[in-house]
């Protein structure tokens, strides 16, 4: 029988000298010579069977792997404690499980078996201690002389309404420097005198603070037109300036804003002066850049036990700081740098929270 040398290619077709039939020469890795005893059709059929067998073996391996995974999942579901051991999580003790392995009767008289509850991992349990429980914001009147708190007066606030439009379609709007530049120019007013956004920023900073939620903050607004407004600690100031403007227009027209669910007044216009609403033992100060600098925490440490403090902050772009000279005791500065009204409120808030231990 003639022999052929091994080729590098996978195989080739050659014509037999005896039968003149094409024969497929297949390369073998185990021998150096290849016999030509098989025809091309037989070899191609063998290759097809081998490929089908390889595919079948791969499918069998995949099925076997899926069966093993399913069996392991079923085993873990039957024994949940094994999952805790694998994750390294210690099971919590549950004392209020009632008859976990016994039968329990329901009110209708039927008996049913209780399902044993699986304890939660330790990391997913959030324990709330007593001091972390939120205290509802409450209004503290001037008659309360024992509760120590911070009183903030936003003085010279730019809250002024103006009738805009023609006679029939005229509407009242909150005067601001962005939308009413023509009106301000007509009234010969400075643009800095129409900045209600400063009051908006200060109210958001004050009323969102933990000090207010703990019931240790009281806020008053004294406008440039000598209108005094009392702010309820439970009020939620609108986040957008457009909605805040509409709320202020309604307040200055109706003189009060009531809550939807009750008769409680969230914002109301009260009579001057602001000192009528301060506790008798209150210490009063104004923030001024020209005054001696003292850190807010050190200033609070000079207070007497149960003594409240009232801080007057100018809610304006710029101007003199003599707006509260008639009723304050002193002027202080809390920074070596000029601060905005919102930042000044924030610094005093944080210092008062640290001083009272409010987290």
UniProtKB/Swiss-Prot annotation:
It catalyses: a pseudouridine in rRNA + S-adenosyl-L-methionine = an N(1)-methylpseudouridine in rRNA + S-adenosyl-L-homocysteine + H(+). GO terms for cellular component: cytosol; nucleolus; nucleus; small-subunit processome. Homodimer. The record marks 197 as: Stabilizes Arg-195. It comes from the Eukaryota. The modification Phosphothreonine is found at residue 33. This is Ribosomal RNA small subunit methyltransferase mra1. Residues 1-62, 98-118 are annotated as: Disordered. It is found in: Nucleus, Nucleolus. CDD domains: Nep1-like. The lineage of its organism: Eukaryota, Fungi, Dikarya, Ascomycota, Taphrinomycotina. GO terms for molecular function: rRNA (pseudouridine) methyltransferase activity; rRNA binding. The record marks 195, 236, 239, 243 as: Interaction with substrate rRNA. S-adenosyl-L-methionine binds at residues 287, 314, 319-321, 334-339. The gene is mra1. Its main location: nucleus. Keywords: Methyltransferase, Nucleus, Pheromone response, Phosphoprotein, Ribosome biogenesis, RNA-binding, rRNA processing, rRNA-binding, S-adenosyl-L-methionine, Transferase. One of its GO terms (biological process) is response to pheromone.
């Amino acid at each position: 029988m003639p022999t052929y040398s091994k080729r590098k290619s996978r195989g080739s077709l050659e014509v037999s000298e005896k039968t003149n039939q094409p024969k497929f020469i297949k390369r073998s890795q185990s021998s150096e010579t290849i016999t030509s005893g098989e025809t091309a059709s037989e070899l191609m059929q063998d290759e097809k069977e081998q490929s089908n067998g390889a595919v079948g073996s791969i499918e069998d391996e995949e099925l076997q792997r899926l069966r093993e995974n399913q069996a392991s999942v079923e085993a873990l579901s039957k024994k949940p404690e094994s999952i805790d051991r694998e994750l390294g999580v210690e099971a919590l003790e549950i004392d209020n499980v009632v008859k976990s392995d016994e039968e329990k009767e329901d009110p209708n008289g039927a008996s049913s078996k209780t399902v044993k509850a699986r304890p939660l991992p330790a990391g997913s349990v959030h324990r709330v201690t007593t001091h972390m429980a939120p205290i509802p914001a409450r209004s503290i009147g001037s008659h309360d002389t024992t509760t120590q708190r911070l009183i903030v007066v936003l003085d010279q606030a730019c809250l002024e309404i103006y009738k805009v439009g023609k006679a029939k379609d005229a509407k009242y709007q909150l005067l601001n420097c962005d939308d009413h530049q023509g009106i301000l120019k007509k009234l010969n007013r400075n643009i800095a005198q129409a900045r209600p956004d400063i009051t908006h920023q200060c109210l958001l900073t004050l009323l969102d603070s933990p000090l207010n939620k703990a019931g240790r903050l009281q806020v008053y607004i004294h406008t440039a037109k000598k209108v005094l407004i009392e702010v309820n600690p439970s009020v939620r100031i609108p986040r957008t300036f457009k909605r805040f403007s509409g709320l202020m227009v309604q307040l200055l027209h109706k003189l009060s804003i009531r809550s939807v669910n009750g008769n409680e007044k969230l914002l109301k216009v009260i009579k001057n002066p602001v000192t009528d609403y301060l506790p008798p033992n209150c210490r009063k100060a104004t923030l001024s850049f020209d005054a001696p600098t003292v850190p807010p925490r050190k200033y609070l440490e000079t207070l007497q036990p149960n003594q409240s403090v009232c801080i007057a902050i100018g809610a304006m772009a710029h101007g003199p700081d003599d707006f509260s000279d008639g009723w304050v005791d002193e002027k202080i500065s809390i920074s070596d740098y000029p601060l905005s009204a919102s930042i000044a409120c924030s610094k005093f808030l944080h210092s008062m929270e640290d001083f009272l231990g409010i987290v």
